[in-house]
Amino acid sequence: MIAWLDPHDPFPPVDRALGPDSEAPGLLAASADLSPQRLLIAYRQGIFPWYAQGQPVLWWSTDPRMVLRPEDFRVSTTFRKTLRRVLDDPTWEIRIDHAFRDVMVDCATTARPGQHGTWITEDVIQAYTALHRRGYAHSVETWHGGRRVGGLYGVALGHMFYGESMFAHRTDASKIALAALCAFLGSRGVAMIDCQQETEHLASLGGAPVPRAAFLAHVREAASAPAIVPWHFDKSVLRRWTARNEQA
């Protein structure tokens, strides 16, 4: 049995999340509340929302937790060549927070193999847009020829970044945005990006699962660090990857 949270109720301890043998490993609580304040409290405790349309807000603390360390971002020989073309071609841009809400809509509406529907409802868009206005949520956008062709969004607290979703309307467009984000965060001393749940795609990019206890210990320290300001960069940060020795 999971807890139902009224608006002012605290989250239960994360060790009360459903275990690996349950139908929903990591499920901790449910609520009707997706306020910006509730989201900030959740992220500081290593908890994230994820639910289907028509369900209450479901709160999760998975064990293990999928993370991506910026220095572990995987750059193949082919993708390194792509990044060099992006750097050399002025029609390619990386924009930050230029169209935050539109990025969320793109993440919600872009078709994905094996996925039907989206959890990024209008209520979710409104909640994260409110976080964006307060300086906590950011988008990293790949533009080509004046068109937004890929991107991602997430939440930044101190020296912690919590990735939420990404989309691509062109091959590698979201991966280019992630490469830029990893280069920027790595240069600012950010050691970990929360990717929430393990997938083959995230693993192919360098993500790896870590025990929940280790993840939470890192979050407690990193999320309380001073905020990264200014939150701004451009495609020049991609040189971090094109200058490195090639990886398989």
Curated annotation (Swiss-Prot):
GO terms for biological process: protein catabolic process. Keywords: Acyltransferase, Cytoplasm, Transferase. Pfam families: Leu_Phe_trans. InterPro entries: Acyl_CoA_acyltransferase, Leu/Phe-tRNA_Trfase, Leu/Phe-tRNA_Trfase_C, Leu/Phe-tRNA_Trfase_N. GO terms for molecular function: leucyl-tRNA--protein transferase activity. Its EC number is 2.3.2.6. One of its GO terms (cellular component) is cytoplasm. It is found in: Cytoplasm. It catalyses: N-terminal L-lysyl-[protein] + L-leucyl-tRNA(Leu) = N-terminal L-leucyl-L-lysyl-[protein] + tRNA(Leu) + H(+); N-terminal L-arginyl-[protein] + L-leucyl-tRNA(Leu) = N-terminal L-leucyl-L-arginyl-[protein] + tRNA(Leu) + H(+); L-phenylalanyl-tRNA(Phe) + an N-terminal L-alpha-aminoacyl-[protein] = an N-terminal L-phenylalanyl-L-alpha-aminoacyl-[protein] + tRNA(Phe). Functions in the N-end rule pathway of protein degradation where it conjugates Leu, Phe and, less efficiently, Met from aminoacyl-tRNAs to the N-termini of proteins containing an N-terminal arginine or lysine. NCBIfam families: aat. PANTHER family: LEUCYL/PHENYLALANYL-TRNA--PROTEIN TRANSFERASE, LEUCYL_PHENYLALANYL-TRNA--PROTEIN TRANSFERASE. HAMAP family: Leu_Phe_trans. Belongs to the L/F-transferase family. This is Leucyl/phenylalanyl-tRNA--protein transferase.
